[in-house]
């Protein structure tokens, strides 16, 4: 059976998948890194949708996820999840990162989405070590898809070659590619 998990190197904002995941901050108001890139590419409709979510439920806690429209993106929707800031690994960061991936997958499944694309959550300015973050991402996604039919296709979208190699190596070790 062809693998359901894929690694791509490039710009997550260009993917025509059902839903892309935004590594958001708790304010949901946009920021740097992939968060800023997604907001810029999606246009003002995304910020308006995030403001509406925030008015309804307040900030998005670390490890949680919310879903909005995609604005001008080719994706159908955006799931915004808040990964943890790395603080030496002594503040439940591993579990919170796991929760960010898991809650994103659950939202995609609940909305019937067949394809989802993830950035490397928390590995930019939040400082989560790349190798540890990739292991958590791959394990969380792999465990989820063994028990669920949706999403059918999961993409890890890496901004650079180093992360791409890291994810490919982990998937090869698991026998998923």
UniProtKB/Swiss-Prot annotation:
Q: Which GO terms describe its biological process?
A: purine nucleoside metabolic process
**Alphabetical keyword list:** Hydrolase
The EC category is hydrolase
Residues that bind substrate: 11-12, 25, 33-35, 122-126
Q: Which EC number(s) does the record attach to this protein?
A: 3.1.1.106
What is known about its subunit structure?
Homodimer. Interacts with RNase III.
Protein name in the entry: O-acetyl-ADP-ribose deacetylase
């Amino acid at each position: 059976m062809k693998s359901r998990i894929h690694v791509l190197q490039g710009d997550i904002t260009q993917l025509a998948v059902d839903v892309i995941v935004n590594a958001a901050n708790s304010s949901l108001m946009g920021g740097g890194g992939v968060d800023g890139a997604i907001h810029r590419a999606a246009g003002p409709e995304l910020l308006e949708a995030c403001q509406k979510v925030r008015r309804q439920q307040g900030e998005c806690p670390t490890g949680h996820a919310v879903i909005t429209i995609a604005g001008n993106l080719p994706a159908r929707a955006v799931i915004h999840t808040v990964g943890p800031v790395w603080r030496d690994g002594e503040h439940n960061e591993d579990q919170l990162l796991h929760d960010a991936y898991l809650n994103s997958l659950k939202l995609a499944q609940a909305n019937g989405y067949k394809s989802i694309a993830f950035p490397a959550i928390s590995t930019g300015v939040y400082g989560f070590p790349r190798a540890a973050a990739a292991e958590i991402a791959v394990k969380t996604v792999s465990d989820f898809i063994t028990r669920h039919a949706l999403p059918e296709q999961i993409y890890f979208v890496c901004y650079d070659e180093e992360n791409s190699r890291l994810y490919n190596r982990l998937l090869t070790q698991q026998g998923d590619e």
